[in-house]
A protein has these predicted regions:
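Transmembrane alpha-helical segments of polytopic membrane transport and secretion proteins
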Residues: 1-54, 282-302
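Short cytoplasmic-facing helical segments at TM-TM junctions of multi-pass membrane proteins
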Residues: 180-222
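Periplasmic/extracellular loop-to-transmembrane helix junction in inner-membrane transport proteins
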Residues: 36-44, 69-112, 252, 256
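Transmembrane-helix boundary motif in ABC transporter permease subunits
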Residues: 109-139
Length: 302
């Protein structure tokens, strides 16, 4: 009886120590976490809005100074007002939003296709050793291959149509998404996987509840890179493969400016491509990153 009481006391002590250790770790994690509090509107404007606005204003000032200094011929470097006139004309003609929507719709649809293909492919490569040995190096090689290299064969295989555009996007984005997920899975502590298996989270259930949530940082990095590759692949395809049947996207607009020697049109297309890329990052990927950080206790919202 005394031995049983001693064992019970020791078990209780071990359990209390484990709880104390868990509480200590939770407290340390809370101290290390970055606290996010609601900031005043004036502070947000000063810290988040004013710096990029000032940077854009500085670029415009330097640009205009170069125009006044006549560092090059007018047809090589248009003035800011000439580019703005292009924006105004495109808006007045009702074509500005059409240029943007044509490219965005293609890019987002192609990226969603790449997501549907790249996610299971990445899981397969990460979890099956034979598959990783067989196609892992191929995925890495495809990721380093410039996406513009796929445009000529895609045109020959599929012709000048939207299928060709989507094929180029897939070939550029799928390897990045798959490799990002593989990197995320490789960073999962083995203890988490064993704990999930012990609790019965195996197969698809383990993948959904353990593997995917634990691999989110690497997966999200792969998604961001996959979108960047999708957007660049699409622009390359639109520039090289122009056809009246395809409509006019931002890449075709850039190529039209080159064909007509209109640098103001070229600059307009470049700025629109840049703005769309920034907008997608701010509206989609930045909120996703904050959500992942907050879910992992790296951001604490007061």
């Amino acid at each position: 009886m005394a031995s049983t009481d001693t064992t019970t006391t020791e078990d209780a002590a071990v359990k209390d120590a484990a709880q104390d250790l868990a509480g200590l770790e939770a407290g340390l994690d809370a101290l290390d976490a970055v606290r996010v509090s609601r900031t005043p509107v004036r502070q947000v404007l000063a810290q988040k809005v004013l710096p990029p606005v000032a940077a854009v204003a500085l670029v415009l000032i330097v640009w205009q100074i170069l125009i006044w200094a006549k560092v090059t011929d007018d047809y090589k470097l248009p003035s800011p007002t000439q580019v703005w006139d292009e924006v105004s004309n495109a808006w007045a003609q009702g074509t500005l939003l059409g240029y943007i929507w044509t490219s965005i719709s293609r890019g987002l649809f192609g990226f969603l296709l790449a997501l549907v293909i790249g996610t299971p492919l990445g899981l397969l490569v990460a979890r099956v050793k034979v598959v990783r040995a067989a196609i892992g190096p191929v995925l890495s090689g495809l990721q380093s291959l410039p996406s513009v290299a796929w445009v000529p064969p895609a045109v020959l295989w599929l012709g000048l149509n939207d299928k060709m555009m989507y094929a180029v996007i897939l070939l550029g984005a799928v390897p990045s998404i798959a490799n990002g997920l593989v990197a995320g899975v490789d960073q999962i502590p083995p203890l988490h996987l064993r704990a999930g298996q012990t609790l019965g989270a195996t197969g698809l259930r383990g993948t959904w509840h353990i593997v995917l949530p634990a691999s989110l940082p690497g997966y999200l990095a792969g998604l961001k890179q996959g979108w960047a590759f999708s957007w660049r692949s699409l622009m390359a395809a639109e520039i090289i493969a122009s056809s009246p049947d395809l409509g006019v996207g931002l890449g075709q607009l850039l190529e039209q400016g080159r064909e007509t020697s209109s640098m103001s049109t070229v600059f307009l297309a470049i700025f629109l491509i840049l703005i769309v890329g920034i907008a997608i990052d701010l509206l989609i990927f930045s909120p996703l990153e904050r959500w992942v950080l907050r879910s992992r206790g790296l951001l604490v919202k007061n």
